Structures are given as C-alpha cells and as structure tokens.
C-alpha cells in the first residue's frame, strides 16, 4: 500500500499527498502483500496522492503492474492497484511491510484497527 509518506517520497519524490480517506464497501486483506476485496460492511483506509507520469511508472514497477497488480479507476480519476487473478489465499505480511503501512496510517490519521483486523484474518487463515 502506498500509505507511507517516507516510502512514497523515496519512490515518487514529486508525489503530493492529498490526505487519507476511507473507501466504502471495501476491506483490506493480506496475501503476503496488501490487497482489498468488496465488503459492504467495511471501509478501506487509503491515502490519495497527486502523482506525475514518472511517478506512475515507478509505482507500476513497484506494484508489478500488469502482472501482479492491475490499475483500477475509482471515483472518476482516482487510481488504485488491485491484485490480479483469483487472488489466492490470505497470507501474513512481513513485519517490515506491516510496520511501513502502520506508519502510513499514523502519518495520515487513519484508524489502524483495519490494518490489525486484516493481519489477524491472514494469520487465522494461515
């Protein structure tokens, strides 16, 4: 997930954070790395960034586009990376990856309950 301010500054120095928000009807999941699925009872904490074309290319490389993740437009012009294929089984994230997302949630005032719940779901499924 591209929630962490420092990580985004390193990979996309010209990206401008527009803030954190909650995407309705979606749930954070982990398949080793972050993904999401439809869930009418949940929200997905995300960070909206204004990015350049160079930043998009850098994010595409990072996200394994178009092999691992595909791009999906939501709310008009907003872009989100969505894992391809049948998405496979849930899997726990590495502690470093989890910590990076957690710091991003803190950076933007997002509730980390959703992060902890997704990690717990992945742990129980393993």
Descriptions of predicted regions:
Residues 1-126:
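Glycine-aromatic micro-motifs
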